[in-house]
Each structure stands twice: as structure tokens, then as C-alpha cells.
Amino acid sequence: TCVLISSGLHAQTTQGSMTLGGNFGYSSSKSEGFYGVYTSSSFQVSPKAGYFIMDNLEVGLGFGISTGKSGPDGSEPTKTNSFSAGPYARYYKFTSNDRFAFTGALGFSFGSGKSSTGNSENKTGSMGISIAPGFVYFLTERWGLDFQLNGIGFSSYDPNKDVDNNNQKEFTFNISSLSPTLGFRYYISK
């Protein structure tokens, strides 16, 4: 009976299976400095759909929707909204515990958004590549709890897309800042 249960758990990641799910994240901070109290908050949702092209290798399409607000207390806050989309590939490496697998993901994203303070509004554009380690814990044969760190990434960001050709490029390494995302996935076996 144990063999049937463990082999059933690996069925979610076999060639021809699919997955639906996503991650979500929220951050909030408040700091006091020379110019007073500064507050910041953001929320993001990232739905994904994937297909296993071979055992333990998923490819799919992900979307990102985020909103945020920041600024000094007593002043008009800066509000941001953005949308991104792009393909990803994710590999699953199961441990001796058949309910637990380490994951490594490679993703590409293309996005746009806007930033506004009072009556002033700027359109933004971005493009990025990321490598993200994580793990999935299978709660049942169909549901997995997904945890991912924002790993190594390269992004190109244009903070004022509608006015000039000013581009900022940055290399980010986020493991030390521990920017985790948490989500659920539903696995559909073939």
C-alpha cells in the first residue's frame, strides 16, 4: 500500500500532467528618518498555468499583477500599478519524502504599468529574467503548497516610458533579502 501511495504522489509531475495555481505576496514597512515617517505597502498576485513536457519538468505561462503605495506621512503618496506576463520552466527534485520536492525555476517577464503622485502620472515598462529556488509540499495528491524565493534576476526598467529614452538596468540578487512568495497549485494528472 505504501508503494502505491508514493507512486501516486509522483503522478502529478509526470509527462502530460498540468498544473494551475500561483503565488501571492504582501509587504508593508514604516520607517522614521530625517524627513519624518515614511510608509510603504505592496501586494502582488501571480497566477500560473503549466504543462509537464517530461517527468518533473514543467513549462508554462505566468502573469503578475501588483499594486503599491509609498511616501512620507502627511504627503500625497506615490501609487503604482503594474502587469507582467511571460514564460517559465520549473524542475522538481523529489526527496526521500515523496510529499516534498525542491524546485528550481527560470522565468522571463515583460511588463508595463503606471506610477502616479497627485496629478502627475508616468508610464513604466520592464523586462526581466529570473532564477528562483523553492520547494513544494504536496498536501494531497492534487494540492501543493508552493514556496519560492526571489533568486537571481536581471531586469531592465524604464521609469518614464512615455517621455524619453531613459533606461535603468540593474542586477538583483535577492536571496539575502528573503523576498519569499507563497502559493498553492492544483495538479491535474494525465
Which residues make up each language-model segment?
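Extracytoplasmic loops and strand-loop junctions of Gram-negative outer membrane beta-barrel proteins
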Residues: 30-32, 115-118, 164-168
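Internal, hydrophobic beta-strand segments that form the core of beta-sheet-rich folds
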Residues: 149-150
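Short, polar loop/linker segments at the starts of domains and inter-domain junctions
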Residues: 34-38
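Cleavable N-terminal export/targeting peptides
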Residues: 1-16, 189-190
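Gram-negative (and chloroplast) outer-membrane scaffold detector with strong preference
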Residues: 18, 24-28, 43, 48-129, ...
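Individual transmembrane alpha-helices with interfacial aromatic-anchor signatures
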Residues: 168-178
